[in-house]
Structure formats: structure tokens, C-alpha cells
């Protein structure tokens, strides 16, 4: 079977939202899809994600199509959960203070969704069918309350047991549960949280000396710097129950999924040795939290999760997919070492640790453009950071951005990442609460040309007449194209905004040798922190820092382009082993493994 390729984030039509700011009353406009539930049902793969109004469908895990879901479903409710139960797919979503219903169908794309009246409210639901036919339900999304679990009556979906507290956040001991960029903030005491809230009120010119009980309760939750423990997903493998959960917050680069294990679906649960299970704090697009784990038709395991942009709004997010699995010792892992590089997929059993076939060629390459705004120069399109971008000075068709690779290289793929910036558009419809999701079919149209000499250009891909709106389009030239220059001309983007490119990313093969093995130091800087210092080397573009609880289980990784990297995701008291790999345009070279002192 011929290989096919994709590159995270998934290249889908992420719908725009108009979210009313409670302070200013103005709308913040951004795209979002998050909290994905992925299933295999009747031979096809389906992803249900928050705020998409749709389900994404694929035959091969590479090419996805979006299909509108019926308005009878709670499409404005976060974290849709789907599970296959017999001939049915069951659907539920999140709402606080209102009873949440269940829905089921035998035909996702064409069938009716039968409503099953609910009996309680929940947030971040997850349904799980055990081998013995018993049905369990998990939910929770809070920095005070736990992840809950209960057994349900299969016909009525009414709880058969009392809800049970399963897991709580422990940021004092579990490093990856701490909030902030790179886990930079420790939790506060209740007294400290209240004082911080008072400072906030004073800065707003409001009374901070006479707090109500309600305000004090609010402060203890929202100003505590405690993690939100959320996004449960249960997987059973060889008799062990793996309760996955997300934290510490979707707006951070360290949003990831941890995992607990048990011999029973309702616990007691023990923290797994391999944590965090899904974790991507570095690279072009960061974050890999609140997701789901699924086995495909060929016995390969996959994990899909939420990736963070959070520039136009905290909830500006995307969806990624990575290989996952269980090792010979039953350890659940997810491979995110090069998690936003092109990934090959074959319709067969595959190696979850296969290295990338192509390498990054575009990092910090020379860029020019038809125009740009100050602070949004074309160089931001090659800095491997989706949170920065080139923005043209105008919005007329024909604005362009161009890259010089430095010399002719063997190019195999190009990813074109569009950003949004300062969208000024009228509200297209009526809000539901604070939000309106735009169902319109916008268009993103462009032309990608290439040249070996800078004079004679040929078309690499033409979407100048496209009827689609794909912000992370991916062009594959599997046989290779010998080029030095690329030019992207933009003809249309949504809402007639100025075109913005956060990443014109090129992959293939350079003309040199792999980098030498990196020399590095690894030192503990706290019970949950370590610092990696790498000796700079001219033959490396960047590095991957790997770590794990055994020399042969280095399942966590952080990509960096700097010679120093802090890692705050350690678990107190756990043994840690480290390795640093170097990469450039020609390959990847592994470093030595050593214990963290």
C-alpha cells in the first residue's frame, strides 16, 4: 500500500467564533476545534471536536472531510464525547447547572440521533463500555473537585451506583500539573489566592476591602493557581484500566494528558510511571491535552488531542494526532518527538517509533514579501512558532511572501499555515450565550510557486479557485522537487482580512551530513524540575530533549531550538533518565542516555 502523509495540526476548516468579551462587550474572533473524541465505527474514523458544528470523517486517518451535524445535538456545548456501544454511537457534551442528555445513532452521517433524557449535569464527559457489557461514565473539569466515575444502566443511562471520586490534582507533587508557561507557577494557599484577588480588584478600581462570601469562594478557585483536572478518557488494555486526564489548562504550552492505572474501572487508581502520557511543550505548535486514544483497523494505536495557539483568544486551538501504544510491560505511551512534522501512514501495522522521513528545511531562512506591518515581518513565517506571523500591510488579492532556501534542495512537502489577526467583521448571526459559531463556507485561495534559479518559476500547488477554507494546507511531492525559492501568493482569506502566515514550513533533504551527537548537561533544579544545557554546535538546527523513568522508556520529549531548556514536568520522587538528540536538514543523531542526578 502506498504511503500517505499528513502534518499536524489537522488540515481542516476550523470554524470561526464570535465570543463576546464580558468587560468590553466587543467580539473576539478566532478559530477553534478542541477536546477531540476519535472513534472507529463501521470501517471509518470519526472525530468529534468542540465548537465545530460538525464531525470529521476519514477512511485512512490522512484525508478528512467535515460533515455538518444536526442542530438537535448540543453543538454549542464543549467537549463532545462519543463511544461505540454495540450498533450505536453514543454522544454527550458538557453543561453546568443544566441536566445533560445522551444521544445515540446507528448512522452518524445520515441517521437520526435518538435522545435519551439525562438525570444529572456534567462537564467533560466520557462513556466507557467494558468487556462484560457494563457501562461506565466519567466526568469532571475543575481545579477543586475531582474526576468522578459511576456505573450507568445501559438502557436508560441512569446511574446504578453513587458517583465515586477517582482522582484529584496534586500539583505539589506532580510537576506537569502545575499551571503557567512551562509549569512556572506553584499553587497558592486559600489566603494567598484571596489576597491576589484583592490586588486584582484594586487594579480595576473596585472595592477590595468588603468581599462577599461568593467573591471569596470565587477567589479561592480562580486565583489559586491550581490546575484544572479535566478531559477524562478511559482505555482498557490486557485487563488494565488506563484513566487518562488533561491538565493544567488549555491556554498553556504544557497542556497535556496524564494517566492513572487500575485493575477496576472505578479504581482505586495509581499514578502511572509514564507521565505525562501526551505532552508537547515545544516545536511549531505546542500542547497535546484533552484528547482520546483509539485503535485503528490494523492494530495501531493513536492519540488525538488539543493544540494551543491562544493569541486571538485563550480558546484559539487546533487538533493533532500522534502514534501511541502499549509497550511490552503494558506502559501506555504517545510518540510526539517530531509531533508537528510530516508523518507517513500506511494501511498496515506500523512502528509507532518510526523516525520522520523528511527534515525541516525552512527554519530561519531568508524571507521577503510584497509588504508587511511593523512587528509582523516575513521572517516570522520561518521561526517555527505558530504564535508569531507575517502580516501583509494590505488586504488586496496578490500579496505574497517568498523564501530562499539558500541553495537547491530536495523538497518533499510544504505546510502553509494561515493565521488570524485583528479581524474586524460584523456579527453574522445570533449568539447562544456569549458565543456565535459562524457556519459560513469561507474560502482561502492561494498559489504556491517554486524555482531553482529565482527566475524560472513553476506551479507547485494552485488553490486560486478553491472552494475550501483550510488554514494548515499541506502539499506533498513524494518523489521530490529540486528547488531553492518558493513564493506564496494569497488571493483570498476569510473576512477580507490582511493575509497572515504563521508558518511557511518546508520539509525534505538538505545537501550535507547529519549533526554530530550533542554534548549536554542535565541537572535537577527542584523536586519536579530539571535544566538541560547543550553545548552549541554549528551542524545542528535544533534538539529534542527526551526523558523517562527507565533508559529504554524515554517516552517524553521537548523540541527546542535553544541551547538551554527547562523541563518542569517531573513527578516528585521518580527516577529520571535523559537523552538529547540533535537534528538538522539531513537527519537526526541520538545522544547518550544518562540518569538525572
Where are each of the predicted segments found?
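Beta-rich carbohydrate-recognition and catalytic domains
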Residues: 1-224, 236-241, 245-283, 298, ...
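Extracellular Ig-like/FN3 beta-sandwich strand-entry sites
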Residues: 481-483, 540, 573-575
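Short beta-strand elements bearing conserved aromatic residues within extracellular beta-rich modules
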Residues: 150, 446-448, 543-545
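Short, solvent-exposed loop/turn segments in extracellular or other extracytoplasmic domains
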Residues: 466-473, 559-566
Amino acid at each position: 500500500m502506498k504511503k500517505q502523509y499528513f502534518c499536524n495540526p489537522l488540515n481542516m476548516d476550523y470554524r470561526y467564533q464570535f465570543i463576546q468579551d464580558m468587560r468590553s462587550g466587543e467580539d473576539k474572533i478566532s478559530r477553534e476545534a478542541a477536546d477531540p473524541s476519535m472513534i472507529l465505527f463501521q470501517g471509518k474514523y470519526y472525530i468529534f471536536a468542540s465548537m465545530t458544528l460538525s464531525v470529521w470523517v476519514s477512511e485512512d486517518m490522512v484525508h478528512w472531510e467535515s460533515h455538518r451535524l444536526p442542530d438537535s445535538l448540543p453543538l454549542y456545548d464543549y467537549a463532545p464525547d462519543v463511544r461505540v456501544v454495540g450498533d450505536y454511537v453514543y454522544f454527550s457534551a458538557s453543561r453546568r447547572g443544566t441536566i445533560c442528555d445522551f444521544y445515540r445513532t446507528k448512522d452518524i452521517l445520515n441517521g437520526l440521533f435518538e435522545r435519551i433524557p439525562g438525570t444529572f449535569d456534567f462537564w467533560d464527559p466520557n462513556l466507557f463500555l467494558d468487556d462484560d457489557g457494563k457501562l461506565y461514565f466519567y466526568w469532571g473539569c475543575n481545579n477543586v473537585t475531582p474526576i468522578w466515575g459511576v456505573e450507568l444502566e445501559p438502557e436508560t443511562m441512569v446511574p446504578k451506583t453513587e458517583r465515586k471520586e477517582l482522582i484529584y490534582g496534586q500539583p505539589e507533587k506532580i510537576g506537569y500539573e502545575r499551571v503557567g508557561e512551562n509549569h512556572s507557577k506553584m499553587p497558592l494557599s486559600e489566603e494567598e489566592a484571596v489576597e491576589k484577588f484583592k490586588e486584582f480588584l484594586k487594579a480595576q478600581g473596585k472595592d477590595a476591602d468588603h468581599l462577599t462570601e461568593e467573591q471569596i469562594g470565587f477567589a479561592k478557585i480562580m486565583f489559586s493557581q491550581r490546575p484544572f483536572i479535566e478531559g477524562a478518557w478511559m482505555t482498557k488494555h490486557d485487563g488494565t484500566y488506563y484513566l487518562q486526564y488533561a491538565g493544567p489548562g488549555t491556554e498553556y504550552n504544557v497542556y497535556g494528558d496524564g494517566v492513572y492505572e487500575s485493575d477496576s474501572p472505578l479504581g482505586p487508581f495509581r499514578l502511572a510511571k509514564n507521565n505525562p502520557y501526551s505532552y508537547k511543550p515545544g516545536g511549531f505548535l505546542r500542547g497535546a491535552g484533552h484528547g482520546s486514544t483509539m485503535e485503528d483497523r490494523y492494530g495501531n494505536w493513536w492519540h488525538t488531542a488539543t493544540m494551543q495557539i491562544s493569541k486571538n483568544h485563550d480558546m484559539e486551538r487546533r487538533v493533532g494526532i500522534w502514534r501511541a501504544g502499549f509497550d511490552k510491560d503494558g506502559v501506555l505511551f504517545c510518540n510526539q518527538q517530531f509531533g508537528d512534522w510530516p508523518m507517513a501512514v500506511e494501511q498496515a501495522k506500523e512502528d509507532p517509533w518510526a523516525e520522520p522521513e523528511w527534515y525541516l528545511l525552512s527554519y530561519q531562512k531568508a524571507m521577503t514579501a510584497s509588504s508587511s506591518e511593523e512587528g509582523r515581518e516575513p521572517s516570522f513565517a520561518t521561526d517555527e512558532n505558530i504564535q508569531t506571523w507575517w502580516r501583509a500591510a494590505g488586504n488586496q488579492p496578490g500579496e505574497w511572501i517568498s523564501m530562499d532556501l539558500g541553495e537547491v534542495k530536495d523538497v518533499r512537502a510544504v505546510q502553509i499555515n494561515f493565521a488570524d489577526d485583528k479581524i474586524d467583521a460584523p456579527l453574522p448571526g445570533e449568539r447562544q450565550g456569549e458565543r456565535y459559531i459562524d457556519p459560513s463556507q469561507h474560502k482561502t485561495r492561494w498559489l504556491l510557486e517554486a524555482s531553482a534559479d529565482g527566475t524560472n518559476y513553476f506551479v507547485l500547488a494552485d488553490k486560486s479557485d478553491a472552494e475550501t477554507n483550510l488554514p494548515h494546507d499541506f502539499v506533498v511531492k513524494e518523489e521530490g522537487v529540486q528547488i531553492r525559492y518558493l513564493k506564496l501568493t494569497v488571493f483570498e482569506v476569510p473576512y477580507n482580512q490582511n493575509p497572515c502566515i504563521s508558518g511557511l514550513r518546508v520539509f525534505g533533504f538538505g545537501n550535507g551530513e547529519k549533526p554530530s551527537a550533542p554534548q549536554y548537561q542535565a541537572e535537577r533544579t527542584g523536586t519536579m524540575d530539571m535544566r538541560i544545557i547543550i553545548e552549541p554546535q554549528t551542524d545542528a538546527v535544533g534538539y529534542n530533549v527526551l526523558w523517562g523513568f527507565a533508559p529504554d522508556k524515554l517516552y517524553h520529549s521537548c523540541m527546542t531550538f535553544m541551547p538551554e531548556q527547562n523541563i518542569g514536568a517531573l513527578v516528585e520522587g521518580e527516577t529520571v533518565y535523559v537523552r538529547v538528540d540533535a537534528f538538522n536538514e539531513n537527519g537526526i543523531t541520538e545522544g547518550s542516555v544518562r540518569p538525572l542526578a
